[in-house]
Amino acid sequence: MSIPQLRKGRQLDIPVALITTVTVIGLILLLGIPVAKLIGIGVSERGLAAITQSFGANVDTLVNTLVLGLCVGIVGTFIGFVTAFAQVFLTFPGKKLLHWVTLLPTISPPFATATAIITLFGKRGIITYGIFGIENNIYGLVGLVIVLSLTFAPVAYLNIRGMMENFDNSLFEASATLGAQPLSTLVKVTIPMVVPAMLASFLVLFVEGIADLANPLVLGGDFRVLASQIYFAVAGSGDIASAAGIALVLLLPALTVFAVQKYWSNRKSVITVTGKPVGSLKEVTASSVKIPMLVPVYGWIVFVIVVYMTLFVGSFVKILGVDNTFTMEHFWYVQRLGSSAILTTLSMTLVAAPIAAVMALIIAWLVVRKFPKIGKILDFWGMLGIAIPGTVLGLGFALAYSNPTWLFGKQILPTLAGGLAVGGGAIAIILVYIARAIPTGQQACISALKQINPQVEEAARSLGASQVSTLVKVTLPLVRSGIVTAVTYGITKSMTMITAIIFITTPQTKVMTSQILDEVDAGRFGHAFAYCTLLIGLVLIILMIANLLVNRLNRSTRTVVK
């Protein structure tokens, strides 16, 4: 009887093997081939020669890039810490407003705020020149740090707040019992416990800062960074080898920082989780702590509101700060010339997001349930979609898929990127959307699977269900809220993405963010503001629908999970 059981077990493993194979092939297409092609050209004789010939300029650019990353990491992490601390430990007017204001930059295009910053603080800025009479040069390092910190501070806020909410209140009670003052408790207890989350946030913001392309193009001025150098090498001189070489220089620190961040993320539970009842955290009322925290918090709230009100108001006036006459001209322009870009962007994201969510679920299932020992490799591989700078990934796609893909002398894929590609290049853009959306969904599904008792799935298996049937009929319903979250994130991030697709957009496949960037380059800020307002409105509608759906799914599955 043992032989039939063995055969049956092998038969049951065949679908798992097929799923694993298809998933690995998908990751190879999404990440392996583009990165391999980029590395191949970057380390070629032409690529290395291009780097050597411009070594001095590249060193200066590398230093600029690292300085920018450090500044964004420090400022963004500080904003994340004070806003998270205020949200968790303080009671003050506008507390709910702080949460939503802090999350607002996550649903807008990355360079939308740069346009508003120029309008407010440029040489003829509404605030700098209109109020104070100062001709301020906002272009360069300072402007980039302001905009990028505003854009990515929500990442630090969510990360640090999540750790603070898991603090054990007994630690603060013990500190007070020993006679420590509130400020001393903040410095000697709170900050040391939140260091892992702060370091992880700093590293994430560092990578985002050095990888961003759109803001340096709009606000960089003479301050060159590696991402913009890659763009100018391709768009300006058509020097693909030089661009690939510079991309490798950008890729190395990004992957190194990602590996360190992954290590610290895995360690943070050691400090916060004690295994004892946590209880509610005690409110901090001491003015020695409250005032220093609330001053930057209220400054942050006012700053973000002013920036986004500039976007909104600017879309309804002729020229904000010059001719404030009410007009709908900018929206008529978008409706007349940009409606196709809106529909194309929305349709591509609606295709990419579900595929990314399914792949994220499968990767998480393989990592947690099927291959826990070697799952870290697959987990790391799937996370490369966000670890690799968008500029580097987009260039890799342009290099890899601008021509047919061949294997052993046979064509296995047609041209996917470029104006002559299948679908006008839309397939390559969708693939980039998928690659960039997988990591967040993957982490959400891994967390959800770890919270589900494996005996639930084992019970289905004992009743004769196959592994695939168990995945579809048991596991999927239990993690569907995570799937909805993954789909929502995929849609919102894809709709606001530009850095990773700037090299593969085509006239046949217009994307909203690319259209906005064109309007900014042409100095038509009103049109850009109108695009941004519509884009933010679309994303908000999607988020509200997803929030209602997640709440309903959580209510329907809570009893089953218990």
Regions found by a protein language model. Give the residues of each.
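Interhelical loop and adjacent transmembrane-helix boundary motif
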Residues: G9-V16, A49, Q53-G56, Y139, ...
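Cytoplasmic-entry segments and transmembrane alpha-helices of multi-pass inner-membrane transporters
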Residues: A17, A86-I117, F172, L186, ...
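Transmembrane-helix boundary motif in ABC transporter permease subunits
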Residues: I51, C71-T102, T115, T185-T190, ...
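C-terminal transmembrane helix and the adjacent membrane-cytosol boundary/short C-terminal tail
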Residues: S2-K8, I14-T20, P34, G94-K95, ...
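Phosphate-binding active sites in nucleotide-utilizing proteins
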Residues: M293, G299-I377, W381
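Membrane-embedded alpha-helices of multi-pass transport/permease systems
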Residues: G32-G40, F78-F85, A112-T115, T128, ...
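Membrane-interfacial helix termini and adjacent extracytoplasmic/periplasmic loops
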Residues: I3-G9, L48-A49, G56-V59, G94-L97, ...
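Transmembrane alpha-helices
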Residues: I74, L104, S149-D168, P182-A211, ...
